[in-house]
Amino acid sequence: MKRIFLPFFFLISLSISAQTRNKNNKAIFLEDISWTKAKEVLTVDAVVVIPLGAAAKEHGPHLPLATDYIQAEHYKNMVALERKVIIAPTFSYGLYPAFIKYPGSTTTFFTTSRNMLLDIIRTISAFGPKRFYVINIGVSTLPALQQAASILKQEGIVLYYSDYARPNYENAEKGIKEREAGGHADEIESSNVLFMRPELVDMSKAVDDTTGYTRPGPLTPVPMAPGKLSPSGIIGFATFAKAEKGKRNTINFTKELVKDIDSVATCALPVPKDNSIAYKSFLGNYTGAKGESIEIGFDNNRMYYIMNKGRDLRKFFPLFPDSEDHFTSMYVDFLFVRDEKGDVIRLWCSFRGDNFWLTKNR
């Protein structure tokens, strides 16, 4: 089904081009190793770090669209020097709806962003790891991260992430920035990129713009259009940026990331939710008008399906809940329908773009 495959083929930047790693790294970069080596290092005790930063999102006329991505890449390399973790490839697309009126800026839908995280974390977790940390370079990404963390908790998996609004990250900027107003392509963010990738910054185009600072909503460069007017796409005082400020902020921010990762490494794992009772009403055989058949079964605390009495792929593609009566897997979407008594009586199936109804056999 096309919608399900999008996160895998279009929404993730694997960053697999040849790179020179620091010889002092303690971390292992997943993209650099073979599957046999991955089998050795993806243990239950491993912490997997996932950098998340947009590679196509406006950051004013002076910064590149890849500003978030540049920061995510830099921070993952800083973390690699400090802790023996597994670092996954960087996610370069996500939920950034506030910037889509600026050419070159991209966003996914909320469900795509959330499911992208769930898909990748569940895939890696199947090999052992139950502790995940996202280096989150963004704010609009938080709702998807929060919901993904809540869902994964019920599966016995820890997901934690950096959040600029937490006091420890706010404190990282104290004593560095000269102007309080800001939040996007501002003094701090511009300073970060000046330090990390100075050749990509054109400070002659930097301006101080707080027109979009006063009220919530998406930004727009067009006067009289819906949303917050921000002619530059900047919220804050970009002209105050200096590479030295970026260096200091980066060091402080990395310290907070490492503290977070240490807490993930040592926290108690959640107890997975027992689904045996909740899923009981879905189990059984379903038949379609054209002879289609689907068996819904239960194994290892998860539901699985067998379509048209074909191969049993329960170990490969279990069903995951999207809502109370909606489940998804690699190729399918299932929506279960109940009668007035609350009993499951029908099943809507979307399989690789084909949609059909089935009735539960009594």
Language model features with spans:
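Bacterial Sec-dependent N-terminal signal peptides
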Residues: 1-20
